[in-house]
């Protein structure tokens, strides 16, 4: 690619290459879905038809075919990883029968820890531990109470090169690699990530708040392109970079954008526990800085 990876540029490239398997970060699939799928199914009549047994299945198949075609049309499955996949987007992919799966890993594990074939994908999970890899949730109740995800096996590194201190904080004496991620695991071994332990926030009364879960909901709200949830004192604030294409199309002013964000805040709060509700949404004037895998560099914004 010689241009910025916009949905249009990506779809053109994939149409040319026609890959047999895709491994992508969530940002890519979310952009393509919002560009190629959502505009076609937002109509109230279409939503109603999609709920009807026979007609609905036909529409879903057509939507799935369109999305498959937009991604080259030649792949066995799309493997998504590197960050959390938006729950609403995933539920849509699952509902239309799209061939996707979500994996989880780390560089220290070369890099895969969990994976499921698309035929066994469970919505919200990142699969089960791969062959030769043990996995454990460090929690008294791994099904219901999030704990740190630990793993050991042939994929796990021996240690960090010439850094015994870092190795000692990550690998324990029993060979378990401490991922720093928090999650739960169901009876079948499917892992559900809640967020990073270092990202977890504490409410005024000691409640655990996972900002990623709030961000997942906020990212589905009107005009939201990218978002972060941060703590300012004891208050939670949503940082939002708005969708510039929509702003231009609708001819929105700054006051219009502020009003939409306040409406978003009022709409999202009833779906959150009282201790996790947003007190404000701040509009950012430029995109968030990101890592090479397109995750937002959270540490740059949490201390402002």
Residue ranges and their predicted role:
Residues 1-17, 209-214:
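ATP-dependent adenylate-forming carboxylate-activation enzymes
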Residues 11, 64-67, 168, 215:
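Short hydrophobic/charged patches on amphipathic alpha-helices used for structural packing
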Residues 22, 82, 135, 189, ...:
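Residue-level signal for inorganic ion chemistry
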Residues 129, 143-144, 148-203:
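Conserved ATP-binding/catalytic segment of the ANL
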Residues 156, 190-219, 246-256, 272-278:
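Adenylate-forming
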Residues 226, 234, 265-304:
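Conserved C-terminal "lid"/linker of ANL adenylate-forming enzymes
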């Amino acid at each position: 690619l010689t241009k910025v990876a916009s949905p249009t540029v990506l779809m053109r490239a994939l149409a040319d290459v026609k890959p047999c398997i895709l491994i992508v970060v969530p940002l890519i699939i979310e952009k393509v879905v919002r560009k190629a799928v959502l505009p076609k199914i937002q109509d109230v009549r279409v939503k109603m038809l999609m709920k009807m047994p026979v007609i609905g299945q036909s529409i879903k198949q057509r939507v799935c075919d369109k999305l498959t075609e937009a991604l080259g049309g030649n792949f066995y499955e799309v493997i998504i990883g590197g960050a959390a996949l938006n729950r609403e987007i995933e539920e849509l992919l699952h509902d239309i029968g799209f061939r996707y799966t979500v994996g989880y890993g780390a560089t220290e594990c070369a890099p895969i820890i969990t994976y499921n074939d698309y035929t066994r994908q469970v919505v919200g999970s990142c699969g089960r531990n791969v062959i030769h890899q043990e996995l454990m949730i460090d929690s008294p109740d791994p099904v219901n109470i999030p704990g740190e995800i630990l793993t050991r096996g042939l994929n796990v590194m021996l240690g960090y090169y010439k850094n015994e201190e870092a190795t000692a904080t990550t690998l324990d004496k029993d060979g378990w690699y401490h991922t720093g991620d928090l999650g739960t695991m169901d009876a079948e071994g499917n892992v559900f990530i809640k967020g990073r332990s270092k990202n977890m926030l504490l409410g005024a009364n000691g409640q655990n708040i996972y900002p990623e879960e709030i961000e997942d909901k906020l990212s589905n709200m009107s005009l939201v392109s990218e978002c972060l949830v941060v703590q300012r004192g004891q208050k939670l604030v949503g940082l939002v970079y708005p969708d510039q294409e929509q702003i231009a199309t609708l001819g929105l002013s700054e006051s219009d954008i502020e009003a939409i964000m306040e409406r978003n805040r009022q709409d999202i709060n009833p779906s959150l526990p009282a201790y996790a509700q947003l007190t404000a949404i701040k509009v950012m004037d430029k995109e968030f800085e990101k890592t090479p895998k397109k995750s937002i560099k959270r540490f740059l914004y949490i201390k402002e």
